[in-house]
Amino acid sequence: MNPEKFILELSKHNFVLTDKQKEQFKLYFKFLIEVNEHVNLTRITEENEVYLKHFYDSITPLFVFGDVFKDGATLCDVGAGAGFPSIPLKILKPSLKVTIVDSLAKRLTFLKDLIAKLGLDNVELVHGRAEDVGQNKLYREKFDIVTARAVAKMSVLSEYCLPLVKKDGYFVALKGPKAEDELDEGKKALAVLGGKLIKDEELTLPGTTEERTLVLVKKVKETSKKYPRQAGTPRRKPIC
């Protein structure tokens, strides 16, 4: 998917990019590849692949769960790495107020420089483990939307993300193909943490056979104060 095809595909979903947005994606790609030479940010480095598997993939929730991403909504991205999905979402929806949580300082340095280059405002970077941030009263149950892409399986991911979602807010997980087993396995964790599965939708990346699953969870009750547990525990002993 070259930049022109990317622009065309977005227009099919009623997203017509401005010149500024086109330039932001172009700068994003260039800076990602430049920094990736000395900081391990991504294995995907070819332009067509970055536009498809990072940029397009990151914004698919806007096509499927568009009503969730209201103007001015607060969004927390857990384990964003090189900024996916939150930075592409922010480029398309500039009114989003974004907080990015990541445990690696090198990635946050890249993101700080990227945000400046792209001229983005209302983006906060938080250095820490999701388990610790989820117990911090500055962030706990403060967000309308929490996103995570390719971070952990659903039973673990729910414990990272749901404590950050405010009641009646949403957790959006960007998963790979055939996530049914993972969703079944994660049902108990969702219930324990105050979440309710609203929808899971499969889609195929344009021009490929690569499948993705988008998962929408609503926060229907507050999360018990005992969650998230100590850093490392959710991965070692998932709720199941």
Curated annotation (Swiss-Prot):
The main place the protein resides is cytoplasm
Q: One GO CC annotation, please?
A: cytosol
Membrane-crossing ranges are: none
In short, the EC number is 2.1.1.-
Mind listing the UniProt keywords for this protein, alphabetically? Cytoplasm, Methyltransferase, rRNA processing, S-adenosyl-L-methionine, Transferase
List ligand-binding residues for S-adenosyl-L-methionine. G79, F84, A130, E131, R149
**InterPro entries found in the cross-reference section:** rRNA_ssu_MeTfrase_G (IPR003682), SAM-dependent_MTases_sf (IPR029063)
Q: Which SUPFAM superfamilies match?
A: S-adenosyl-L-methionine-dependent methyltransferases
Please state where this protein is localized. Cytoplasm
MF GO annotations: rRNA (guanine-N7-)-methyltransferase activity
Recorded hits in NCBIfam families, A to Z, give:
rsmG_gidB
Q: Which family does it belong to?
A: Belongs to the methyltransferase superfamily. RNA methyltransferase RsmG family.
User: Function, please?
Assistant: Specifically methylates the N7 position of a guanine in 16S rRNA.
Protein name (Swiss-Prot/TrEMBL): Ribosomal RNA small subunit methyltransferase G
